[in-house]
Design a protein with these regions (language model features):
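Conserved beta-strand hairpin/beta-sheet module of binuclear metal-dependent hydrolase folds
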Residues: 1-47, 114-130
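Residue-level marker of motif borders
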Residues: 4, 53-57, 104, 122, ...
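Active-site HxH/HxHxD metal-binding segment of metal-dependent hydrolases
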Residues: 16-17, 40-98
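Active-site environment of divalent metal-dependent phosphoester hydrolases
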Residues: 20-21, 42-43, 59-66, 82-85, ...
Length: 198
C-alpha cells in the first residue's frame, strides 16, 4: 500500500474495502513513530517494519486486527477497547505527549472512541463521526452528538482526519456545523436522532 503524505510529519496508509481495513495514520514525533489504528490484514501492514507507539480509535476489527503482528512499544486504548483486545494503557482523559494530544471522543458509532490531535493542526477521529444503522436509518444518540460537538469545539486543530473518508481530511468547523444541524433535528422525547439512508 502506498503511504500518502498529509504534511512533513503526518501520512497514512489508505484503508481497503475488501478485506475491510481502516486507514492507518503514521505520525513522526521526534525520534518516535506513532500509528493511529493498525488496520486489518497483512497487506495493510506490509511496509510497517519499525517499532511503534499506537493509539487505537476504537475496538472494531478493521482498526485493531493487526495489533499482534506489529512491534508495539506502547498502545493507548479506551477501556472498551482494552476489554476487547486485552492490552494497552487506558486513556480515559486528555493525555499530552510532546505535540500529541490523545482525547476521549463521544460517538454514536460505538463506545470508547479515542482521537489524536497532532501539532494542534490535524486531529485523527477514526469512525467517531459515524452512526449505527437500523433498518433504513442512520441512528445517532442525541446526547453523544451534543457531547462530541463540545469535544470538537475544544480542539485547536482546524482539520479532522476521518477513517474510511476519501482523502481523509475534513474541515473541523464544517463537521461541527453538520453535527449541530443534526442535533437540532432530535425529537423532544427521544434519545435517538434517526436519519433516512440514501
Amino acid at each position: 500500500m502506498k503511504e500518502i503524505a498529509i504534511n512533513e510529519k503526518i501520512s497514512y496508509l489508505e484503508g481497503t474495502e475488501n478485506p475491510l481495513s481502516a486507514d492507518i495514520g503514521i505520525i513522526r514525533e521526534g525520534d518516535a513513530l506513532w500509528l493511529y489504528d493498525v488496520g486489518s490484514g497483512e497487506r495493510a501492514i506490509s511496509q510497517l517494519t519499525g517499532s511503534y507507539h499506537v493509539v487505537l480509535s476504537h475496538f472494531h476489527q478493521d482498526h485493531t486486527g493487526n495489533m499482534g503482528k506489529l512491534h508495539i512499544k506502547e498502545a493507548f486504548v479506551s477501556d472498551e477497547t482494552k476489554h476487547h483486545i486485552k492490552m494497552g494503557t487506558v486513556a480515559d482523559r486528555d493525555i499530552y505527549i510532546g505535540n500529541l494530544h490523545i482525547f476521549p471522543l463521544p460517538s454514536s458509532h460505538c463506545k470508547g472512541c479515542l482521537g489524536l490531535e497532532v501539532d494542534e493542526t490535524y486531529a485523527f477521529v477514526g469512525d467517531a463521526l459515524y452512526s449505527k444503522f437500523r433498518d433504513d436509518y442512520y441512528i445517532f444518540n442525541a446526547q453523544l452528538v451534543k457531547d462530541a460537538i463540545a469535544v470538537l469545539k475544544k480542539l485547536k486543530a482546524p482539520y479532522l482526519l476521518v477513517s474510511h473518508f476519501k482523502g481523509l481530511v475534513r474541515c473541523r468547523d464544517e463537521v461541527i456545523a453538520e453535527l449541530t444541524e443534526l442535533y437540532q433535528h432530535r425529537g423532544k422525547n427521544s434519545p435517538e436522532i434517526k436519519v433516512k439512508r440514501g
